[in-house]
Structures are given as C-alpha cells and as structure tokens.
C-alpha cells in the first residue's frame, strides 16, 4: 500500500523524523528533502527490479531468436525525420540464430490516418501504391495481428510476449537480458523513431513486448568487424552478395538483413542487444557491450 504523501509542515517533519532525517528548515526546504528522499527510494526500487529480472554473466540468457523488422513510412522528399512519418508497411521475420534460418514471417501493409494520401516521392521510393494502403488495416489492428503472430511462437520465445516485463532504464542498462529473443533492425530508426512516433501519434500505450533492448544491426556490424558504418548493400558486399528484391520495400529489406545475420552467425558472432528505446525521443545505447564501439578515424 502506497504511503500518503505528507502535505503540512508538521506531517513532513514527522515523516522525516521517522526516517532519521533532519527536520530543520522551512516548508519548502522540508518538501525538497522529502522529494529527494522519494526520488532515491524510487531509484532503489527500480534497481531492485533490475536485479530481479537481470542475470549473472555465468547464467546469462543468450539470444536464440531475432525478430527482424524493417518498416516503411510516409515521407516527403527533403523532409527526413522531421516529417510526421506514419508506418505503411510492417514486416517481421522470426530468425533462429542457431539454425541460421527464418522460422516464420509476418507482413502487413498499414493504412495511415493523419496523411492518408501518399506523396509521389513516397510511392516512387517504396513502390507502395495508394490502393494498397487504402485497403490495409490501421496500425492498432496490425499491431494486434503481430502480437497474435508472436504469441503463436510462445513455445520458443522465452519469456513469451504475454509474460515479458521491461523495466525502464536508469543510468545504465544491464548488457545481459533475461530473454532469448530480441527485436533487430537496420539502425535505430525503425524502433526508436518510426514505431515510437506511431505510438505517439495514435496515443497508444507501448506494450512491453515491443519496447526495451534491441539489436541495431548496422551499428553491431560496424563494431564486430571494426569498419565504418554502412547500409544494407554495404554489409552485403562484405561477403560479395547482392541485394535481392526491391530496395526500400520493408519485406525485402528485412529478408536481406536476415542474410547478413546468417553470414555473421556462420562466423560465430554472438548477437546481443546494443540499443534500447522506451518511447519517442527516449532511447539510448546499452553500455559494456561484448563488441566495443568502433569509431572510424
């Protein structure tokens, strides 16, 4: 049961005295002292929850599966990320890092609501036509379909999407995660920008199963091979491979990312989360990674 926050000077002094804290000062000083104490307690509670859900290095949960995504979104030429991008295509590939293969695929187009008419630039870039998104479900319905798709694999995803609980990061995030699966994408933008924006626009709560730590494949590749950061084509060229399908089509981009992951697995690369996100403009790096960040000279 939550303790009632003291409001009067006498109540604050009694509460501070019970905690063995100073009761000197005016009401404002006493309130600040109480708030500081509450902040410290909240940080301690979060840290205890982290310890509960994190694992030791000896017993860490290694990633077995990646959920590879590459969303496409509405766009205007020259606007970049300042544009109010809405998701129009959402693929998800369930990839087995041990078997080095795709187990299952999810794919759906999404109907935008704020700016339902695609720009000529967007249609040219993605190849997605107006008639395709006009008959597509809205984002909330696609998200429910994706949840059902992932729930279908609850026998291998540990914990399942029904059970996962993500704790909000403090100053650092544990490198080892109590999950055998993680989201993965090309750079941070799919998760920390496009998806985060979509939840913000739709005023939807962000479920624990889609936020938290994820693998930024582009940065992960850079750190593993000690090379400058590059795009999907650049990563494929490392093995003499060519892009298959149409660039900037979400499902084709995701499949080519899976080819990169497969090659890295064949070279005994151990995948781990290197980024996290909680909501729009609330994201960051996971410190103490196995592959130290590479900074090209």
From Swiss-Prot:
Active-site residues, Swiss-Prot/TrEMBL: 72, 248
Pfam families in the record: RNase_T
Annotated GO CC locations: cytoplasm; cytosol; nucleus
Molecular functions (GO terms): 3'-5'-RNA exonuclease activity; double-stranded RNA binding; double-stranded RNA-specific ribonuclease activity; metal ion binding
Residue stretches making up the SAP domain: 4-38
Domain spans labelled Exonuclease: 68-153
Annotated consequence of substituting residue 252 to A: Disrupts exonuclease activity
Record annotation: effect of changing residue 248 to A: Disrupts exonuclease activity
Positions that bind AMP: 72-73, 248
Root EC class: hydrolase
Known EC number: 3.1.-.-
Annotated residues for binding of Mg(2+) 1: 70, 72, 253
Coiled-coil residue spans: none
Binding site for Mg(2+) 2: 70, 190
Cofactor(s) needed for function: Mg(2+)
GO biological process, one term: regulatory ncRNA-mediated gene silencing
Cofactor remark from the record: Binds 2 magnesium ions per subunit.
Keywords recorded for this protein, A-Z: Cytoplasm, Exonuclease, Hydrolase, Magnesium, Metal-binding, Nuclease, RNA-binding, RNA-mediated gene silencing
Compartmental location: Cytoplasm
PANTHER family in alphabetical order: 3'-5' EXONUCLEASE ERI1-RELATED, 3'-5' EXORIBONUCLEASE 1-RELATED
Protein name: 3'-5' exonuclease eri1
């Amino acid at each position: 049961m939550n303790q009632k926050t003291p409001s009067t000077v006498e109540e604050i002094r009694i509460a501070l005295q019970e905690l063995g804290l100073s009761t000197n000062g005016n009401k404002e000083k006493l309130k600040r002292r109480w708030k500081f104490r509450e902040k410290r307690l909240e940080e301690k509670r979060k840290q205890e929850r982290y310890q509960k859900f994190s694992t030791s290095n000896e017993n860490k949960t290694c990633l077995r599966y990646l959920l590879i995504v590459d969303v496409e979104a509405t766009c205007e030429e020259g606007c970049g990320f300042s544009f109010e991008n809405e998701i129009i295509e959402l693929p998800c590939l369930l990839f087995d890092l041990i078997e080095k293969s795709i187990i299952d695929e999810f794919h759906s187009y999404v109907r935008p609501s704020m700016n339902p008419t695609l720009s000529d630039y967007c249609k040219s870039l993605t190849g997605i036509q107006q008639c395709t998104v006009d008959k597509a479900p809205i984002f909330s319905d696609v998200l429910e379909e994706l949840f059902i798709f992932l729930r279908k694999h609850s026998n291998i995803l540990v914990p399942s999407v029904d059970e996962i609980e993500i704790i909000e990061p403090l100053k650092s995030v544990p490198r080892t995660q109590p999950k055998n699966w993680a989201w993965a994408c090309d750079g941070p933008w799919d998760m920390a920008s496009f998806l985060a924006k979509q939840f913000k626009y739709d005023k939807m709560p962000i479920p624990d199963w889609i936020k938290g730590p994820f693998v930024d494949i582009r940065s992960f590749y850079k750190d593993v091979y000690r090379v400058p950061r590059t795009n999907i084509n650049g990563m494929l060229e490392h093995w003499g491979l060519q892009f298959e399908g149409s660039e900037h089509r979400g499902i084709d981009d995701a499949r080519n990312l899976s080819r990169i992951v497969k090659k890295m697995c064949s070279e005994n690369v151990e995948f781990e989360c290197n980024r996290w996100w909680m909501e729009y403009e609330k994201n960051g790096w996971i410190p103490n990674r196995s592959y130290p960040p590479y900074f090209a000279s």
